[in-house]
Amino acid sequence: MAAGLPVTARGFFNLTVSGPGGSLQVDTVQPAMTEDRGRGPGAELFVDTFNGPIDPVSGHTCTSDADSCRGLAVWSITNPLATAPTLAFAYAGNTKAYTFAPPADQTTCTECIDSSDLRISATPVEKDGFLYAAWESGINNGTQVVPGVVWSQLRVDIRDHGGLFATQVRGDYYNFGGDDAVIYPALMPDSDGNLVMVFDHTSSTVNPEVRLTMRHGANFSSPGVLIKAGEAPYRPTLCGVNGFVCRWGDYSATSYDGFRTNTVYFAGQYANGGSFSRNWGTWLGRVHLDG
């Protein structure tokens, strides 16, 4: 392709996960970005949550703690440019449970900002045999159910003849107290094994803003640093009017600049000044990681 030669794209469709709880034709399957030195994992990796209407293992519909879903579906494609590439599947069932989150609050309205569904909205990342992904969930913070994040670090192994194994080795919830919402996460590991997460944050006292935190060790333990504060409420004449829930952005993003610099570029979403008719903005930045 880089040399201007023709390339034939080969692939698979109608991916379906079947289990004791039923069958689910999956949507929004995310390809993983490989950040390895050298040859990488030996396959192209893809991952997906169970975004309804059913968890094919439990039969649950992801609507409450008692009806929660769990696990990730992982696929690998080996020999992707061959006439007959090999597709393999693995189920990683040991993630945290997840449910559809309520809409988020902002300073002018309650449950009026879309907090996404259960899809992985940012590109997952593979590095050194680990696959990183994060998505939204409703999380009970002790006083109420709020939009929060489930993050997962999977160990993935490409077996002989194109087989695949995947299991979670680290993973947890990430959320705040009160009515604070943590939404649209994007992850990126660095060369020292730390994990960066950029995300959006909003509440009844905070206009939608961009924050960034880092995992040192087993879990994210801090609310991180404010990258870009929200400048105004988001579309206050529309959001929350007669119960209307405003769509919010759909993404955050990260990109690794290389092992020599150990720098992560990121993009997040914030509410910019009210002079914009649809005052939704994207903030770009970079962070240099010193371990």
Give short role names for the model-derived ranges.
Residues 1-291:
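C-terminal PAP-associated
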